[in-house]
């Protein structure tokens, strides 16, 4: 039943998907351009650490936005499956499988953004490191997360 209604009118699903994609794009631009773009100083671990420490709440909001972006990927993946299933159920399942893996990997990778907060708080056990070493370690975690790690 649902199958035939999708074949007749996929516009509703496509519009919902479009709204989800717009939200994903806005959240991605916010996290990348506004948060990391203003707080991460390319090539300068100490300046980056100082900027994150000074704007910790902005950094946390950026992480939350990034994770929300990946949560919104889940209904988008379901919508893509629903829209593509009438064309080829096998390919729709394959696309769903790969999209779910991509989302899981990206969401797990975004957790690296929490590491600078932990390193800069200097929680127990980090006393052996100098502040410069902690700044370098936190910057390294950011490079693991970033697509711009080709510096």
Show the residue positions of the predicted features.
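Perimembrane loop-to-helix junctions flanking transmembrane segments
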Residues: 42-57
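Interfacial segments of alpha-helical transmembrane regions
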Residues: 87-103
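Interfacial helix-start motif at the membrane-water boundary
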Residues: 53-70
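Conserved small/polar residues in nucleotide/adenosyl-binding loops
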Residues: 144-149
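Transmembrane alpha-helix/helix-exit interface in multi-pass inner-membrane proteins
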Residues: 33, 100-126
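Short, Lys/Arg-rich, polar N-terminal cytosolic tail immediately upstream
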Residues: 1-10
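Alpha-helical transmembrane segments of multi-pass membrane proteins
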Residues: 23-42
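Membrane-interface interhelical connector segments
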Residues: 115-143
């Amino acid at each position: 039943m649902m199958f035939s209604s999708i074949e007749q009118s996929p516009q509703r699903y496509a519009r919902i998907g479009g709204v989800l994609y717009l939200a994903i794009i806005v959240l991605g631009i916010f996290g990348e351009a506004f948060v990391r773009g203003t707080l991460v100083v390319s090539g300068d671990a100490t300046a980056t650490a100082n900027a994150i420490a000074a704007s910790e709440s902005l950094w946390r909001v950026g992480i939350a936005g990034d994770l929300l972006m990946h949560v919104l990927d889940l209904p988008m993946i379901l919508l893509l499956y629903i829209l593509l299933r009438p064309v080829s159920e096998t390919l729709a399942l394959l696309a769903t499988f790969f999209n779910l893996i991509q989302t899981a990997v990206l969401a797990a990778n975004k957790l690296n953004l929490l590491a600078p907060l932990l390193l800069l708080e200097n929680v127990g056990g980090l006393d052996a490191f100098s502040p410069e070493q902690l700044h370098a370690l936190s910057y390294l975690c950011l490079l693991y997360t970033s697509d711009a790690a080709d510096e």
